[in-house]
């Protein structure tokens, strides 16, 4: 598997300001500011898959009560998230759980490179936030019909199942709620554009995620000490 500077998916870099309005950097700066003003117990980091989660009622129902922050930027790749985390989005906070969901936008990378990029994110979190338990969400299938990107995302998940157990304080959560039907298609009822999830689909994946987060929060030393007091 590709690691370090030899892996382009593991090289931190800011997104190019293609449209010319500097929105990507503005969003990053807002997240850095949030780190100075808020005290999250749970931090979500990733791309538009994380972004849209915050737009549905399931976020307010399950995650807002956990003092969660959502550091999303649509279109982000592993390299973009690495850059953001290296440049302030992990400073001045001490979350107990960090959820990472990124990789489906790494179109130009191999499965090995994408998995290596996700591992690099986990290693960075381990270094900068050693107290945090990390949850990596598996990449979902995409496209209405079978296609190479589906196959690549599945391979990324397979690679992560083998590699992540070797890293501390991290586990992979498969959140595919059977989105691919027996005929190989994905319904727009689950993914409205055959990539991004509908509210109903988020409800399916968030229940096991919420259960795992609650389990990890209860396992933190602070919670244990409080229970013994």
From Swiss-Prot:
GO biological process annotation, one example: spermatogenesis
One Pfam family cited in the UniProt record for this chain: Lipase_GDSL_2
Residues annotated as the enzyme's active site: 48, 193, 196
Substrates-to-products reaction catalysed: a 1-O-alkyl-2-acetyl-sn-glycero-3-phosphocholine + H2O = a 1-O-alkyl-sn-glycero-3-phosphocholine + acetate + H(+); 1-O-hexadecyl-2-acetyl-sn-glycero-3-phosphocholine + H2O = 1-O-hexadecyl-sn-glycero-3-phosphocholine + acetate + H(+); 1-O-hexadecyl-2-acetyl-sn-glycero-3-phosphate + H2O = 1-O-hexadecyl-sn-glycero-3-phosphate + acetate + H(+); 1-O-hexadecyl-2-acetyl-sn-glycero-3-phosphoethanolamine + H2O = 1-O-hexadecyl-sn-glycero-3-phosphoethanolamine + acetate + H(+)
Gene Ontology CC terms, in alphabetical order: 1-alkyl-2-acetylglycerophosphocholine esterase complex; cytoplasm
Major location (coarse): cytoplasm
Superkingdom to which the source organism belongs: Eukaryota
Keyword match Ribonucleoprotein: no
Recorded GO MF terms: 1-alkyl-2-acetylglycerophosphocholine esterase activity; platelet-activating factor acetyltransferase activity; protein heterodimerization activity; protein homodimerization activity
Keywords: Cytoplasm, Hydrolase, Lipid degradation, Lipid metabolism
CDD domains reported for this sequence: PAF_acetylesterase_like
Record EC number: 3.1.1.47
Location within or outside the cell: Cytoplasm
Function: Alpha2 catalytic subunit of the cytosolic type I platelet-activating factor (PAF) acetylhydrolase (PAF-AH (I)) heterotetrameric enzyme that catalyzes the hydrolyze of the acetyl group at the sn-2 position of PAF and its analogs and modulates the action of PAF.
Protein name stated in the entry: Platelet-activating factor acetylhydrolase IB subunit alpha2
Originating organism: Gallus gallus
Gene: PAFAH1B2
């Amino acid at each position: 598997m590709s690691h370090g500077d030899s892996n382009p998916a593991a090289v931190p870099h800011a997104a190019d300001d293609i449209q010319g309005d500097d929105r990507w950097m503005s969003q990053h700066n807002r997240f850095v500011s949030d780190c100075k003003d808020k005290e999250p117990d749970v931090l979500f980091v990733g791309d538009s898959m994380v972004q849209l989660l915050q737009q549905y009622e399931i976020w307010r129902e399950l995650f807002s009560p956990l003092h969660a922050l959502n550091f999303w930027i649509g279109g982000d790749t592993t390299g973009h998230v690495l850059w953001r985390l290296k440049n302030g989005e992990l400073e001045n906070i001490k979350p107990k759980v960090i959820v990472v969901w990124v990789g489906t936008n790494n179109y130009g990378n191999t499965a090995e490179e994408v998995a290596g990029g996700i591992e690099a994110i986990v290693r960075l979190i381990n270094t900068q936030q050693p107290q945090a338990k990390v949850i990596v969400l598996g990449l979902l299938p995409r496209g209405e019909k079978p296609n190479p990107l589906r196959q690549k995302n599945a391979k990324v998940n397979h690679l992560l199942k083998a590699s992540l157990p070797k890293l501390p304080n991290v586990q992979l959560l498969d959140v595919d709620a059977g989105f691919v039907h027996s005929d190989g298609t994905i319904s727009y009822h689950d993914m409205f554009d055959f990539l991004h999830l509908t509210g109903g689909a988020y409800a399916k994946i968030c229940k096991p995620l919420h259960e795992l987060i609650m389990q990890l929060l209860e396992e933190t030393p602070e919670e244990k000490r409080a229970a013994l007091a």
